[in-house]
Amino acid sequence: MTNEEYIEKMVQITSGFSKEGYQVILASYCREEGDLDAAREIKNRSEQQKNITIFDYDGTNRKQLLEEMSCSIYIIAARFHGTILGLTAGKSVFPILYSDKTKYVLEDLGFHGEYADLRDPDSLSFENAKKNLESGYKIDVTESIQNAEKHFEKLDEFLNN
């Protein structure tokens, strides 16, 4: 999928949610990767721009980012960290995969919801993007978080001996 095709698909998704009355927040996680420019382009080309805001994460506003995510009812995550933070916050998430890394983590977590894969452009659509919201699909990752913490405890033990 080209960058232009991705932007157009995200415009359709953003416009779809905006038309349905949702407030849409486009979160830019990494300026260096072009997230902020992409968010601006998506907003500028979307219908009902008044329902769309851009949140620019700059490394100093982590608390505000987490607050925005915790107040959201649904997260469409185009970045690995967005997916993980959304799931950790107990939110319904629609992941957009750009590599197998996210796919494998989702499989390990037992995620069986809908997602898009950029290698399959047809999977990135408004109709697909709203399925997890409509079904209320969420997964509880509490046990995975606790297990991860135990792994770090074991690593600390190993490194300190």
Model-derived features: where do they sit?
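Active-site anion-handling motifs in enzyme catalytic cores
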Residues: 1-161
